[in-house]
């Protein structure tokens, strides 16, 4: 389900149609990415894309589509069919659409001549000699033959400000771009300011909100809200998302007035109160700024106790990062929810002091029959958070001994232990040395006093990526031989099918490890 609420007086923005030309697109042998690229770019420029058509390499069909679109929209942008082979028929279709004749362009020939020597030399080096000259002649003739009334557009290269190396054909309001995505995107980039001058662009305001509600939960209220702004030139879009773990519906708002935007967003926030998601698809980037914003939001919600826990954990990690060089610090990371919180906090403090390109040292103590999903998450998180993870055999004491042997300089080891953990209950303070009969490391447990709910509050509040097993009914992760989905999260639908709620839906923190047989 999707919904779009458009007021009757949306501003008269410039309109556009995109025509994707090529039999290979219709056959499914080539994926069209050009229309997606063009839609994104045109939308940012304030252009209202009203139509996308995919048509084959047929002159009559190209002509009909061009004629229809050219008369109906301000801009028509085609992609594909402008190459040197027999099935490139866009220029012929344009000539037919505008009742024009084809002619050879010396200007294009000059552009071709600039790269032709390199091309022919390369072909000869590959052993292609016989028939090369004739093939080049025919290809050049095809490339250079365009409708007589064509205007050649030379763009501006972004790198050095010089003219583009190859022109684009325009007839009336129709612009013919190449079909190869790299060349299509480059041509648009180079021509953007020429085709859409800054002073002529429609100024629009865009805003996106996310909610953990389904569309059905608020569709009637949203319809009523849209009606309140029907004379204010507002467009509100509602789009469900079935696979995102953080939100269920995305709302987009467009208007030409910043005042109207503020009023609409305020109304939407009131409508969705308690269910707004501050979605972030890359939580590990610009982490310092996002952390401050997160704490500010929690303060506005009067979550004093939670903020105190955030500050305490942050302070502990900061003290370690300030006191020890990074080569002496290691994070114990097994892909679980608690150490994922620690990974985010450590990345925060390392970014703050050293910058985001600085790697973090970590290690993973393996368990028997480990979930492959947990292994994959460790790999993904290592890439996102720039952490180098070594693997050691378990149990913990054995793994720490292997760590000290491999990296003898390690002193503080950050762990996601909490007081409710089987081993966490023996720790009296968040920072303690291991016992004398253990490998000597400084155990640092910044979230020792956190609850299960606190952990999920932070992970989901910041949209920190976590192992997908937690969305499948697992609340605590061990090995596959001793870990099952949590029975309290089991639901049975009316048709008898079994489902499991995600881990953050568990309401009783004391039951967190009821899905583990060895705890």
Curated annotation (Swiss-Prot):
<dbReference type="InterPro" id="IPR002500">
    <property type="entry name" value="PAPS_reduct_dom"/>
</dbReference>
<keyword id="KW-0274">FAD</keyword>
<dbReference type="GO" id="GO:0006747">
    <property type="term" value="P:FAD biosynthetic process"/>
</dbReference>
<comment type="similarity">
    <text>In the C-terminal section; belongs to the PAPS reductase family. FAD1 subfamily.</text>
</comment>
<dbReference type="GO" id="GO:0005524">
    <property type="term" value="F:ATP binding"/>
</dbReference>
<dbReference type="InterPro" id="IPR036425">
    <property type="entry name" value="MoaB/Mog-like_dom_sf"/>
</dbReference>
<feature type="region of interest" description="FAD synthase">
    <location>
        <begin position="328"/>
        <end position="485"/>
    </location>
</feature>
<dbReference type="InterPro" id="IPR014729">
    <property type="entry name" value="Rossmann-like_a/b/a_fold"/>
</dbReference>
<dbReference type="InterPro" id="IPR056596">
    <property type="entry name" value="FLAD1_M"/>
</dbReference>
<protein>
    <recommendedName>
        <fullName>Probable FAD synthase</fullName>
        <ecNumber>2.7.7.2</ecNumber>
    </recommendedName>
</protein>
<comment type="similarity">
    <text>In the N-terminal section; belongs to the MoaB/Mog family.</text>
</comment>
<dbReference type="Pfam" id="PF01507">
    <property type="entry name" value="PAPS_reduct"/>
</dbReference>
<comment type="function">
    <text>Catalyzes the adenylation of flavin mononucleotide (FMN) to form flavin adenine dinucleotide (FAD) coenzyme.</text>
</comment>
<comment type="pathway">
    <text>Cofactor biosynthesis; FAD biosynthesis; FAD from FMN: step 1/1.</text>
</comment>
<keyword id="KW-0288">FMN</keyword>
<dbReference type="InterPro" id="IPR001453">
    <property type="entry name" value="MoaB/Mog_dom"/>
</dbReference>
<keyword id="KW-0808">Transferase</keyword>
<dbReference type="Pfam" id="PF00994">
    <property type="entry name" value="MoCF_biosynth"/>
</dbReference>
<dbReference type="GO" id="GO:0003919">
    <property type="term" value="F:FMN adenylyltransferase activity"/>
</dbReference>
<keyword id="KW-0547">Nucleotide-binding</keyword>
<feature type="region of interest" description="Molybdenum cofactor biosynthesis protein-like">
    <location>
        <begin position="17"/>
        <end position="108"/>
    </location>
</feature>
<keyword id="KW-0285">Flavoprotein</keyword>
<keyword id="KW-0548">Nucleotidyltransferase</keyword>
<keyword id="KW-0067">ATP-binding</keyword>
<dbReference type="Pfam" id="PF24102">
    <property type="entry name" value="FLAD1_M"/>
</dbReference>
<dbReference type="InterPro" id="IPR012183">
    <property type="entry name" value="FAD_synth_MoaB/Mog-bd"/>
</dbReference>
């Amino acid at each position: 389900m999707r919904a779009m609420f458009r007021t009757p007086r949306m501003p008269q923005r410039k309109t556009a149609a995109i025509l994707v030309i090529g039999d290979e697109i219709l056959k499914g042998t080539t994926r069209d990415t050009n229309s997606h690229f063009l839609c994104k770019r045109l939308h940012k420029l304030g252009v209202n894309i009203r139509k996308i058509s995919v048509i084959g390499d047929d002159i009559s069909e190209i002509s009909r589509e061009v004629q229809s679109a050219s008369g109906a929209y301000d801009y028509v942008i085609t992609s594909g069919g402008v190459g040197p082979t027999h099935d490139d028929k866009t220029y012929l279709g344009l000539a037919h659409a505008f009742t024009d004749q084809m002619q050879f362009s010396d200007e294009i020939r000059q552009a071709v001549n600039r790269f032709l020597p390199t091309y022919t030399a390369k072909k000869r080096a590959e052993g292609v000699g016989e028939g090369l000259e004739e093939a080049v002649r025919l290809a050049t003739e095809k490339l250079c033959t365009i409708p007589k009334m064509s205007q050649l557009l030379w763009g501006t290269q972004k790198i050095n400000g010089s003219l583009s190396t190859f022109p684009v054909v325009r007839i009336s309001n129709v612009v013919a771009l190449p079909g190869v995505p790299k060349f299509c995107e480059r041509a648009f980039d180079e021509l953007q300011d020429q085709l859409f001058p800054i002073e002529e662009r429609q100024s629009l305001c865009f805003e996106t909100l996310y909610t953990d509600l389904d569309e059905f939960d608020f569709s009637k209220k949203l319809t009523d809200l849209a009606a309140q702004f029907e004379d204010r030139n507002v467009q509100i879009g509602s789009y469900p998302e079935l696979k995102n773990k953080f939100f269920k519906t995305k709302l987009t708002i467009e208007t030409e007035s910043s005042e109207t935007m503020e009023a609409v967003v305020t109304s939407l926030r009131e409508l969705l109160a308690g269910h707004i998601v501050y979605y972030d698809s890359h939580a590990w980037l610009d982490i310092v700024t996002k952390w401050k914003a997160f704490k500010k939001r929690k303060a506005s919600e009067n979550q004093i106790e939670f903020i105190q826990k955030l500050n305490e954990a942050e302070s502990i990690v900061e003290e370690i990062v300030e006191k020890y060089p990074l080569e002496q610090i290691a994070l114990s990371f097994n892909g679980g929810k608690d150490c994922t919180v620690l990974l985010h906090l450590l990345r925060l403090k390392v970014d703050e002091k050293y910058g985001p390109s600085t790697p973090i040292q970590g290690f993973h103590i393996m368990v028997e029959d480990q979930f492959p999903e947990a292994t994959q998450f460790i790999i993904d998180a290592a890439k996102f958070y720039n952490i180098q993870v070594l693997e050691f055999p378990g149990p913990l004491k054995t793994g720490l001994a292997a760590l000290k042997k491999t990296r003898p300089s390690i002193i503080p080891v950050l762990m996601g232990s909490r007081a409710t953990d089987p081993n966490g209950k023996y720790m009296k303070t968040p920072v303690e040395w291991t016992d004398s009969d253990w490998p000597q490391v400084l155990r640092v447990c910044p979230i020792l006093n956190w609850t299960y709910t606190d952990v999920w509050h932070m992970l989901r509040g910041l949209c920190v990526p976590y192992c997908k097993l937690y969305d499948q009914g697992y609340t605590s992760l061990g090995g596959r031989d001793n870990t099952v989905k949590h029975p309290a999260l089991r639901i049975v639908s009316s048709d008898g099918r079994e489902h499991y709620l995600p881990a953050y839906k568990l309401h009783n923190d004391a039951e967190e490890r009821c899905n583990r047989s060895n705890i």
